[in-house]
A protein has these predicted regions:
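A solvent-exposed interaction/effector surface
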Residues: 2-4, 13-197
Length: 197
């Protein structure tokens, strides 16, 4: 009887699952790389968002259902909308509130996207934006997020780029992905420093 070692089984499952997750991702151009981070110019895009209260990890769970329902046909046209990556999360006011967003496929704009049926789902158009980005692998803990957020701010401190917005947390993989394979990013909008203007 052949016995497949656990590590080999995980590799096989990942190899099978990975092509199924080959979905559209938010488009960007890499402008510069330094200090372990990237400066990217992101294409204009459309977000479907829900604002929720709760902890860092529970916010995405609370927001997932209304967002998933929206792309599954809970909209004015009963149209199914393709899932994309990444899923974005950012802080909101008051404290302990979060905005969780699905990126809409690039073929949609505010004129063509079907209106949400749920009042808690909002649609916003995002302009082309320059962002500093750090990529890391690992679980979805707040500790890892804060460690890499600090690393990103430190990397920007001595450059010609200044943060000019809140940090976004971007997750690229479904929850079934083993934590050590999960691709995560932290993104911060950046502007030229005064000396560069």
């Amino acid at each position: 009887m052949n016995i497949i070692r656990p590590a080999a089984l995980v590799f096989i499952l990942f190899s099978i699952a990975e092509p199924a997750w080959a979905i559209e991702t938010l488009g960007y151009e890499t402008v510069e790389e330094f200090n372990g981070i990237e400066i990217r110019r992101y294409d204009e895009h459309l977000l479907a968002s829900v604002t929720v209260s709760g902890g860092f990890k529970t916010a995405s769970n609370s927001a997932f259902r209304p967002l998933f329902n929206f792309i599954s046909g809970d909209n004015a046209d009963a149209t199914k909308i393709a899932m994309t990556a990444p899923v974005l999360q950012s802080p909101d006011t008051p404290a302990n509130s979060w905005i969780v967003s699905f990126v809409m496929p690039s073929g949609f704009d505010l004129a063509t996207i079907p209106a949400p049926t749920s009042e808690i789902v909002s649609l916003t158009a995002q302009p082309e934006t320059t962002m500093a980005v750090i990529v890391y692998r690992g679980g979805w803990s707040r500790r890892l997020y804060q460690e890499h957020e600090s690393e990103l701010y430190d990397a920007l401190a001595s450059t010609s780029y200044a943060p000019c917005g809140d940090a976004l947390w971007a997750r690229h993989n479904p929850p079934i992905t083993p934590s050590f394979w999960r691709k995560n990013e932290i993104l911060i909008s950046v502007c030229p420093t005064t000396s560069e203007l």
